[in-house]
Amino acid sequence: MACKQKGDSGSPSSRFSADWSTYRSLSLFFILVTSVNSVGVMQLVNPIFPGTVICHENKMTVEFPRDLGTKKWHASVVDPFSFELLNCTSILDPEKLTLKAPYETCSRRVLGQHQMAIRLTDNNAASRHKAFMYQISCPVMQTEETHEHAGSTICTKDSMSFTFNIIPGMADENTNPSGGKWMMEVDDAKAQNLTLREALMQGYNFLFDSHRLSVQVSFNATGVTHYMQGNSHLYTVPLKLIHTSPGQKIILTTRVLCMSDPVTCNATHMTLTIPEFPGKLQSVRFENTNFRVSQLHNHGIDKEELNGLRLHFSKSLLKMNSSEKCLLYQFYLASLKLTFAFERDTVSTVVYPECVCEPPVTIVTGDLCTQDGFMDVKVYSHQTKPALNLDTLRVGDSSCQPTFKAPSQGLTLFHIPLNGCGTRLKFKGDTVIYENEIHALWTDLPPSTISRDSEFRMTVKCHYSRDDLLINTNVQSLPPPVASVRPGPLALILQTYPDKSYLRPYGDKEYPVVRYLRQPIYLEVKVLNRADPNIKLVLDDCWATPTMDPASLPQWNIVMDGCEYNLDNYRTTFHPVGSSVTYPTHYQRFDVKTFAFISEAQVLSSLVYFHCTALICNRLSPDSPLCSVTCPVSSRHRRATGSTEEEKMIVSLPGPILLLADSSSLRDGVDSKGHRAAGYVAFKTVVAVAALAGLVAALGLIIYLRKKRTMVLNH
């Protein structure tokens, strides 16, 4: 921040002299009346300094008029008695006609002003006794009485503010019209000049008191530049406030800089993100201590410079505030001052970072409860910031894993049993409430390394009322009488699929399904409308027929006694059922080789119908020999392990399979029969050739004998 004073132009006058006491009296008078005075050692001069004074936070720049050449005049900083200050580290630039002097060694602090005396001496030998002294001053912009962050931008949720310390007596033009006029200039590139009334209409607000001027700037105000990095935003605008009054002009300049929503938190650190912009971080101040950038790592702050700047504050540096909204505590910093080097200026901003604390996600609904005693819950990665790592999720106090994951969709599905995985229950009136928790939390707080994983906790609840079906109950009472057990209805279905992924079966309207001889036929038998995890589907026999009738002939065996039919060269292959279905034991999957329906290079039937018999086994108490059969089954045990016809059920495909053969398929089919078919054809060929040769020989012999007999009779 800087302020600038400019007086009317003029040159020293040599017509008015005074002795030393007169100089002291008049000098004190001008100090109290105006901020710019001038006296001469040998004579008084025009009280208005003929140049411009620019007031900075820690120094003063004096610009001399161009008609005052340095070859004729020499400027130096002196004390009130006109003695040169030896410890003043001022810099005189003879080309630019400027003098720069720091407040600390070249000025005195009087009544809230930095006062400095400048002596101009004529270099002409004939006029060396002529010297003129000007008393100039700048307002104290930062005093010991001001708050900790004086000279910094104060950031709030939707605006930024800056406070100037001004010369006493300056006032708002609306409250004291005769005292002077205020103008504001924004945006260095466009240099828009606004009156205070116009600035109020364009996002600026002003507050005056006797010593300070506060400027509040909304983020969408005219001239504000916006930088963005992810969810973090940075706003900045150069400001210049100009106060013009009779005889003087004061310019207050600063650059306002602020960040919005810069903080993300996890269990180990608070991370402050600063979007990429032309400034460079110089220091960080919190807890009344200032740290240079090179010192941050040694004090628990890690710096990451990639796509902007990120400061990771260890949670050991943060304050904690107990809050009902938070899982543990809410972490925050009372204030944080960041100082940047920005376009040859030093700019500071103050933020008040705190970890946003969201309440845990709680679901209270009966829709989560399933009829078979589970809670089905979906968790999405976008439910936290940063995105939730779904691999870190756990259920309750157990290691129960999700039943389904879709990383591309950011989705995980949990199938939580009501009697396991740490599920708790409680009774409330006529309602029983089941409750569990899905969480992703750190066990140590905080760990020693930086983590970008989010904390997450979701409480899931479901309930059953008195009118609902009670499941998974355990009532200790006298054993009931033995009940009569009768087999209940069993619903099965036989389907075929395009490939071994078994994702979507063919519909009823898609039959007949076309298959070439090179293609296997993928079949599946499954149980319908049963949700008991203790039952198991077991195949008995599977076969193919040329008609819809399962008893029609001929028949081609595919599965015998629950095992592959090993009397055929083209064995059936069983496929395991993975966790993609809820009850894998309710399924049987296998494929059939189409060459099994070829005999001696001819397709036995173009339309083939498939059928299976199956039964349901109790996994806890197998009640049929087929329930524990081990493949392969020896021939002498076949049929002995069978079940009664009442226990088995026949199921057929909804339609036929249409088998088509191309020449290559048929040739491969014939070749795959092996030497048995080839040898048989070769044998038949040899026999036919031998018979034909014998017949030709016999006919030749008969003709020869008849010719010989005819010749004998003629003689």
Curated annotation (Swiss-Prot):
Quote the subcellular location field of this record. Answer: Cell membrane
One Pfam family named in its UniProt record = Zona_pellucida
Task: Give start and end of each ZP domain.
Answer: 368-634
Question: Where in the chain is the site Cleavage?
Answer: 171-172, 637-638
Query: What's the chief localization of this chain?
Result: membrane
> Region labeled Disordered — which residues?
466-488
Q: Which PROSITE patterns match?
A: ZP_1, ZP_2
> Propeptide-annotated positions?
638-715
GO terms of biological process kind? binding of sperm to zona pellucida; humoral immune response mediated by circulating immunoglobulin; prevention of polyspermy
Q: How is it modified after translation?
A: Proteolytically cleaved before the transmembrane segment to yield the secreted ectodomain incorporated in the zona pellucida.
Q: Is Membrane a UniProt keyword of this protein?
A: yes
Q: Which residues lie on this side of the membrane: Cytoplasmic?
A: 706-715
Q: Annotated Gene Ontology MF terms?
A: acrosin binding; structural constituent of egg coat
**Assembly and interactions?**
Can form homopolymers that assemble into long fibers (in vitro). Polymers of ZP2 and ZP3 organized into long filaments cross-linked by ZP1 homodimers. Interacts with ZP3.
Functional note: Component of the zona pellucida, an extracellular matrix surrounding oocytes which mediates sperm binding, induction of the acrosome reaction and prevents post-fertilization polyspermy. The zona pellucida is composed of 3 to 4 glycoproteins, ZP1, ZP2, ZP3, and ZP4. ZP2 may act as a secondary sperm receptor.
State the PANTHER family in the record. ZONA PELLUCIDA SPERM-BINDING PROTEIN (PTHR23343), ZONA PELLUCIDA SPERM-BINDING PROTEIN 2 (PTHR23343:SF4)
Kindly provide the name given to this protein in its UniProt entry: Zona pellucida sperm-binding protein 2
